[in-house]
Each structure stands twice: as C-alpha cells, then as structure tokens.
Amino acid sequence: MDEIADKGRYTDEELEEFKALIEEKLSIAKDQLQFYRQQLADLADNPDSKIRGLDDGTGTAENEQLYQLASRQQKLIQHLENALIRVHNKTYGICRVTGKLISKERLRAVPHATLSMEAKKAR
C-alpha cells in the first residue's frame, strides 16, 4: 500500500491495462442493454406472445423489471464511459475525496470506482 501512497497517479502502462478492462466491461454492458431494449420492444410489439399470466399484471411487472434493468445498465455504461475519460485524462484511479490512488484490487473489481475504500467507508 505504501507504493500506492507514494505515487500521484497510475503509470501509462497501468492505465492501458485498466482501459482494456473498462472497454471489455463496456462492451458487455452495451450488449446487455441492447438485449433488455429488444425484450422491451418485443413486449410492446406483441405482449400476448411473450408472457401472459393469470392476469395482465404479470406483463406489467415483467415490463417494469426490464425497464429497471435497462436503466441500471445505462447508468453503468455512463460510469464506464466516464472512467474511460479519466483514463484519457490520466486522472483514473484517483479518489475524488482523498486524492489518493484507489487500490488496483478495487479498480479491477469495480473499474468505474471514484472512491477509495477509505473514503467509501467514511461516507
């Protein structure tokens, strides 16, 4: 951890590693969003063929769940795109509260993180 404290930012090589990880996660997230949108479109075009329970509430619940999943996925995509901007600006991995580097382990688990664990726990 001392190595992290001594550095002001990640090296260009480290940033490239994170960029590749973010781009991979971004591609997956966009594919999932497209899937959710297609499911919503299918339900809108032909609600009777996809799901029909004992009442019309089943279709509405499924529609709402898909909408929430799509919305959450859109937020993830925005966070990942913002992370790519930070990589480009060479500010990626710097905690927005403490100004210290976020650990590589945390960034690998949550590549769009903007808070170190120290700052997150303090919230």
What is each residue range found by the language model?
Residues 1-86:
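Interaction interfaces in information-processing and related assembly proteins
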Residues 37-40, 91, 123:
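Conserved NTP-handling cores and scaffolds of large molecular machines
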Residues 74, 92, 113:
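Residues immediately within or flanking Cys/His clusters that coordinate Zn2+
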Residues 85, 101-103:
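Short functional micro-motifs and their immediate structural scaffolds
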Residues 87-93:
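Glycine-centered tight-turn and secondary-structure capping sites
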Residues 95-98, 116:
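Short cysteine-rich clusters marking metal-coordination/redox-active sites
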Residues 105-109:
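Short Cys/His-rich "knuckle" micro-motifs
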Residues 110-121:
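Cysteine-rich micro-motifs
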